[in-house]
Design a protein with these regions (language model features):
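PLP-dependent class I/II
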Residues: 1-262
Length: 262
């Protein structure tokens, strides 16, 4: 989001989470970040990279902040169906008086594994859609017709296609958590959604980027250093459990071997 805001000549302000140990969203920090120049709030729930879901109470508070300060809320909901342990997702657009000031972004890439199709959609007030349409028509015109038909099929039968995937990702997540629990110096909170997990590596004494590069070089395991997501995530690395269970186990075993060699 930072690069996109900068491309539009805006100034992105990143709000820190509750703490470096708790990556939950901080309502207090959001309030402090608001200035007379603020135009919008960008949300991502369930969150990449933390896998956290913004709870209903926090969603209501953010909606109130937006109304009080006359702000647009841009909500990225591409992981909203990838939920675990009966987790509940609430879209801010459903809050009172938010329909007229919310931009909902979604994609077929995550829910339907259609990353290569480059298909997504947005729902927003008509005046914003008009501006977006002008931009879209001059950049890409429209998605190819076969892609559009694929999207229609996916959206019309979303439950049929996503149910099996959610079941599989639940198994992968549980295997990941079980394997990481065997590593004494690394901890992980169970993600509520998405297919990402943030592993706390603070006790290893390495910075996240140093850790990630060394792990790749020595064990050929690729992770994302937490610093990529801001200073608040320096103590973490992000793992995506998008591979099959065998490869997840193998990857975590290599991670364990690497940590024990430090």
């Amino acid at each position: 989001y930072v690069q996109m805001v900068c491309m539009c000549s805006g100034e992105p302000i990143i709000t820190a989470p509750v703490s470096t140990n708790d990556l939950s969203i901080s309502i207090e920090n959001i309030r402090k970040a608001i200035t007379p120049k603020t135009k919008a709030i960008i949300l991502n729930t369930p969150s990449n990279p933390s896998g956290r879901i913004i709870c209903d109470d926090s969603i209501q508070q953010i909606a109130q902040i937006a109304i009080e300060n006359d702000l647009i809320v841009i909500t990225d909901e591409v992981y909203k169906t990838l939920l675990y342990d009966n987790a509940h997702f609430k879209s801010i657009v459903t809050c009172d008086k938010m329909k007229e000031r919310t931009v909902v972004i979604n994609s077929l890439s995550k829910e339907f594994c259609m990353t290569g199709w480059r298909l997504g959609y947005v729902a927003a007030p008509s005046e914003l859609i008009s501006v977006m349409t002008m931009f879209q028509e001059n950049i890409a015109a429209c998605a190819p017709l076969p892609s559009q038909y694929a999207a229609i099929e996916a959206l019309r039968n979303s439950e049929k296609y996503s149910a099996g995937m959610i079941e599989e990702f639940t198994l992968r997540r549980n295997v990941l958590l079980e394997e990481v629990a065997k590593i004494k110096t690394i901890t992980v909170d169970a993600p509520q959604g998405t297919f990402y997990a943030m592993l706390n590596i603070k006790s290893t004494g390495l910075k996240s980027e140093e850790f990630a590069y060394a792990l790749l070089e020595k064990e050929q395991v690729a992770v994302v250093p937490g610093i990529t997501y801001g200073d608040c995530c320096e103590d973490f690395i992000r793992i995506a459990f998008t591979l099959d269970i065998y490869k997840i186990k193998e990857g975590i075993q290599r991670l364990k071997r690497f940590v024990e060699s430090l």
